[in-house]
Amino acid sequence: MKDTYISEAVKYIGADDTTLDLFESQYQIPNGVSYNSYVILDEKVAVMDTIDERKTDEWFANLENVLNGRMVDYLVISHLEPDHAANIKRAADKFPQAQLVLSAKAKAMLPQFFDIAHLDERCLVVKEGDTLELGIHKLHFVMAPMVHWPEVMVEYEETEKILFSADGFGKFGALSAEEEWTDEARRYFINIVGKYGVQVQTLLKKAAALDIQTICPLHGPVLKENLGFYIGKYLTWSSYEPEEDGVLVACASIHGNTKAAAEKMVEVLRANGASKVVFMDLTRDDMAEAVADAFRYGKIILAAASYDAGVFPPMEDFLHRLVHKNLQKRTFGLIENGSWAPCAAKGMKGILEGMKEVNICENVVSIKSTMKDTDVAKMEELAKEILA
């Protein structure tokens, strides 16, 4: 279990979810996920977000335990997505004296989710640079629109130098899971927030002006040490620069012949000095991990079967995800297969040309049904070009 202790005045009241199969009904989470929420205990009590309704009872139990009979003065709403906001109405009803602290956009969106009586009187709308004094503790509000919803804000507590970062610096994986941070944080960032790199960069510039000693995200562990490492990862991911040198070989094969060619391409790349080669079978491997690997490495080989005069759907799905997540600044190589009219390369190239700052290798490997020695020779040429 990850350490959730923050301080005597700032408490963790979130919960792990280890039975949810798909996050956002699309992303595999074999090690679950945490829904994080926090309480600041001072002259005034502030609750920092709620959690998913799957863990409502646990959240209220944790909250009551920390409050020890005290009442809530403020419920700070950083983000209205239901995995963080599901219990806003329940909390508002339970603590009728509490003010809801939120951005103007969040106030406008709130009635779409909940019918809260006397909403105007209950809301304390804050904007960029506003502060809220709780006693010794003082919250500064920083707007973070489109990271990754329009109403999002983060909060900086100046006394203990804590950044409550909303979905920023989150990761997949329950706190009970024993795993390192980077891989599941990368997969989370790329697939949840990746499209909004410019907005993340804007937020990081604001954060750079703050003296941050602890980061409290809405998913994943509380970050207390080596914060420069985590911030550095976010700077790289949000700038769309490759994280490390290497080649991703992603294939979509119908009967196995295209996969055999892709596996041979892996061998050829290694023989030609590739520092690292990663293979993903898009028909069976986790698509979200494949997308994350495309962000991780600067060079990508795509191997796809032709299908219905186009591209085999798993590859088409993968490429559209890359476009949707705004991948850019990459070099691509293409391998196609077709028994009578290979056309996958043309289809893949058409999608890639919609991306920013991409280079597509001139050498294209076009296979007729099964791999031949002449195809391997073409792979050698492609390997030399993409590794140059």
Give the positions of each predicted feature:
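Active-site-proximal loop/helix segment associated with metal-binding centers of metalloenzymes
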Residues: 148-152, 168-195, 238-243
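Conserved beta-strand hairpin/beta-sheet module of binuclear metal-dependent hydrolase folds
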Residues: 3-64, 154-157, 161-165, 258
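Short, charged N-terminal beta->alpha structural module
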Residues: 250-272
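Metallo-beta-lactamase
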Residues: 4-8, 102-152, 196-202
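Active-site neighborhood of phospho(di)ester-bond hydrolases with catalytic His/Asp-centered motifs
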Residues: 48-50, 72-80, 100-103, 163-167, ...
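FMN-binding flavodoxin-like domain, especially the glycine-rich phosphate-binding loop
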Residues: 175-215, 219-222, 264-280, 290-388
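Active-site metal-binding motif and surrounding structural segment of the metallo-beta-lactamase
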Residues: 43, 54-101
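Short N-terminal or domain-adjacent regulatory/targeting segments
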Residues: 216-243
